[in-house]
Amino acid sequence: MRIGLGYDVHRLVENRKLILGGVEIPYEKGLLGHSDADVLIHAIIDSLLGACALGDIGKHFPDTDSRFSGISSIILLEETGKLLLKSGYAINNIDATIIAQKPKMLPHIENMRKNISIALNIDINKINIKATTEEGLGFTGEMLGISSQSISSVESII
């Protein structure tokens, strides 16, 4: 068994959609980034790549590549899943946390889990997503951005 850790953060700005776990969440601001800036999916991708010693999201989907401009991070997650299988790994589980003062994430978590399950072609029971605040502290507490952390375990299937 191998374990990987992922982290991502993006700034909240006006005139952008807020996409987390492939779900569009109604909110007055969205996350700024080259792709759709889905911090949850980006953290999960990094944790999966890290568990397999395959680098990070920037290595496989660089923000200097126009092919990834505005792309749905769910597509990047699908590609990551294919890369893991090609490299001889299967996903045991994913546990992720979204850190945001607002909006409330609980109403959207099941749809996030479903999207991730479909993108990676794994059982939804292998995916856990939690949300927390920083009690008004730091950049997430001041509603300047949203961050996410993820830990994943994989096993060799070769």
UniProtKB/Swiss-Prot annotation:
<comment type="pathway">
    <text>Isoprenoid biosynthesis; isopentenyl diphosphate biosynthesis via DXP pathway; isopentenyl diphosphate from 1-deoxy-D-xylulose 5-phosphate: step 4/6.</text>
</comment>
<feature type="site" description="Transition state stabilizer">
    <location>
        <position position="133"/>
    </location>
</feature>
<feature type="binding site">
    <location>
        <begin position="56"/>
        <end position="58"/>
    </location>
    <ligand>
        <name>4-CDP-2-C-methyl-D-erythritol 2-phosphate</name>
    </ligand>
</feature>
<dbReference type="InterPro" id="IPR020555">
    <property type="entry name" value="MECDP_synthase_CS"/>
</dbReference>
<feature type="binding site">
    <location>
        <position position="42"/>
    </location>
    <ligand>
        <name>a divalent metal cation</name>
    </ligand>
</feature>
<keyword id="KW-0414">Isoprene biosynthesis</keyword>
<comment type="similarity">
    <text>Belongs to the IspF family.</text>
</comment>
<feature type="binding site">
    <location>
        <begin position="34"/>
        <end position="35"/>
    </location>
    <ligand>
        <name>4-CDP-2-C-methyl-D-erythritol 2-phosphate</name>
    </ligand>
</feature>
<feature type="site" description="Transition state stabilizer">
    <location>
        <position position="34"/>
    </location>
</feature>
<dbReference type="Pfam" id="PF02542">
    <property type="entry name" value="YgbB"/>
</dbReference>
<feature type="binding site">
    <location>
        <position position="10"/>
    </location>
    <ligand>
        <name>a divalent metal cation</name>
    </ligand>
</feature>
<dbReference type="InterPro" id="IPR003526">
    <property type="entry name" value="MECDP_synthase"/>
</dbReference>
<dbReference type="InterPro" id="IPR036571">
    <property type="entry name" value="MECDP_synthase_sf"/>
</dbReference>
<dbReference type="GO" id="GO:0046872">
    <property type="term" value="F:metal ion binding"/>
</dbReference>
<dbReference type="GO" id="GO:0016114">
    <property type="term" value="P:terpenoid biosynthetic process"/>
</dbReference>
<feature type="binding site">
    <location>
        <begin position="8"/>
        <end position="10"/>
    </location>
    <ligand>
        <name>4-CDP-2-C-methyl-D-erythritol 2-phosphate</name>
    </ligand>
</feature>
<feature type="binding site">
    <location>
        <begin position="61"/>
        <end position="65"/>
    </location>
    <ligand>
        <name>4-CDP-2-C-methyl-D-erythritol 2-phosphate</name>
    </ligand>
</feature>
<keyword id="KW-0479">Metal-binding</keyword>
<feature type="binding site">
    <location>
        <begin position="132"/>
        <end position="135"/>
    </location>
    <ligand>
        <name>4-CDP-2-C-methyl-D-erythritol 2-phosphate</name>
    </ligand>
</feature>
<feature type="binding site">
    <location>
        <position position="139"/>
    </location>
    <ligand>
        <name>4-CDP-2-C-methyl-D-erythritol 2-phosphate</name>
    </ligand>
</feature>
<comment type="function">
    <text>Involved in the biosynthesis of isopentenyl diphosphate (IPP) and dimethylallyl diphosphate (DMAPP), two major building blocks of isoprenoid compounds. Catalyzes the conversion of 4-diphosphocytidyl-2-C-methyl-D-erythritol 2-phosphate (CDP-ME2P) to 2-C-methyl-D-erythritol 2,4-cyclodiphosphate (ME-CPP) with a corresponding release of cytidine 5-monophosphate (CMP).</text>
</comment>
<protein>
    <recommendedName>
        <fullName>2-C-methyl-D-erythritol 2,4-cyclodiphosphate synthase</fullName>
        <ecNumber>4.6.1.12</ecNumber>
    </recommendedName>
</protein>
<keyword id="KW-0456">Lyase</keyword>
<dbReference type="GO" id="GO:0019288">
    <property type="term" value="P:isopentenyl diphosphate biosynthetic process, methylerythritol 4-phosphate pathway"/>
</dbReference>
<comment type="subunit">
    <text>Homotrimer.</text>
</comment>
<feature type="binding site">
    <location>
        <position position="8"/>
    </location>
    <ligand>
        <name>a divalent metal cation</name>
    </ligand>
</feature>
<feature type="binding site">
    <location>
        <begin position="100"/>
        <end position="106"/>
    </location>
    <ligand>
        <name>4-CDP-2-C-methyl-D-erythritol 2-phosphate</name>
    </ligand>
</feature>
<dbReference type="GO" id="GO:0008685">
    <property type="term" value="F:2-C-methyl-D-erythritol 2,4-cyclodiphosphate synthase activity"/>
</dbReference>
